[in-house]
């Protein structure tokens, strides 16, 4: 029997062998504070590739040193960082998967000794530092940093780029009226609040012609914040600019209580897919092969992003295949251990 979860998916000239994506998750393991890849990253991402993930997306990688969440984040702000990232893509490719990178700037959530930057001088909460409102010059410099990061991503061998526009980081801060109180062309109307992301996408398109994803927080979980319906217009604009897929997460732009349950964010992937007519990825408490297969069969999303479940078990695709009764092609090195893998957690 054929299963959609294990069917190929082609975006532009990149074909994924299945619909399983390793969701980007910060590892805080660049131990020297220099943004460099370490042996941990090679093992961490290479193992998921060997585990038969279709697309391995590495963690939020800072386009500027001041755009890190912590000083242990990976970086792509300098050419000296390309070599380590290229080793990572080589590990991933050699083990049968495609490689993606998430380009990010932490904005007001940067927990560094340097000043945090944001569209407006509003802290995330009472315990975090007051950010500095970005000047137009700083905005232009950041747009350029995303473009340069895209150039380096190509040099490092990545197949896919994702722009991190979610979880209360810099781009999300510009998009949301809760965090963007600017009175210039970067604030006010939805069109103005989208301008920063528009300029980033345009700048990346000048140097990158591969698949381009954007991760969004499709719900601010606040009465005065953005909802998934607001993101329909945003994602229509993204599609017009050539974005290929929307990775649909939610929350974290402001402190909020979120009702979390299995597949709680799938509704956002479905809504964006239906109303913006663009491919989507579903993410959030997707933990079984049957659940993932159902999402795809219901046409609620095109790709399945797996996060914590891949931390618990790097071989999740094999477990999902066993669960569904699908015979997954094994790496030849593991052919002496056919059959079921324990699903005990």
Curated annotation (Swiss-Prot):
Cofactor(s) recorded in Swiss-Prot or TrEMBL: FMN
Database matches in CDD domains: OYE_YqiM_FMN
SUPFAM superfamilies membership: FMN-linked oxidoreductases
Reactions that this protein is recorded to catalyse: A + NADPH + H(+) = AH2 + NADP(+)
Entry keyword Flavoprotein: yes
EC number: 1.6.99.1
Gene Ontology terms for molecular function: FMN binding; NADP binding; NADPH dehydrogenase activity
Keyword Calcium among record annotations: no
Annotated binding of FMN, by residue: 23-26, 60, 102, 215, 307-308
InterPro entries assigned to the protein according to its UniProt record, in alphabetical order: Aldolase_TIM, NADPH_DH_bac, OxRdtase_FMN_N, YqjM-like
Highest taxon of the lineage: Bacteria
Alphabetical keyword list: Detoxification, Flavoprotein, FMN, NADP, Oxidoreductase
Example GO BP: response to toxic substance
Pfam families xrefs: Oxidored_FMN
Function statement: Catalyzes the reduction of the double bond of an array of alpha,beta-unsaturated aldehydes and ketones. It also reduces the nitro group of nitroester and nitroaromatic compounds. It could have a role in detoxification processes.
Record-linked HAMAP family: NamA
PANTHER family: NADPH DEHYDROGENASE C23G7.10C-RELATED
Protein name, UniProt field: NADPH dehydrogenase
